[in-house]
Amino acid sequence: DPETTQGLAKPFYEEVAALLESKNDPHYNSALVECYSYLGYYYLLAIENPALKAEAKANKDKSIEYWSKILAIDPANATAKRALDGIK
């Protein structure tokens, strides 16, 4: 799923993110940013997916949540800033 359209890696990124969040160790911040980036992008794509039209608002909220988590870790993250600007 190189384009992330099917979200095949989504459950794995969610599991790793939950594990790293539970550790509450800044050493894992770069891995958390990687997880949040994938998940934010997945939900960003899901906003426009006609098959998921009913969940568009929820997907938008989830995407914003993940991009915002990235900015909480790295306030200068340009990708997260661009994604949030594009969503709003």
Question: How would you label these PLM feature ranges?
Answer:
Residues L32, A76-N77:
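Residue-level recognition of tetratricopeptide repeat
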Residues A17-A31:
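Flexible helix-coil transition and linker loops at the boundaries of alpha-helical arrays
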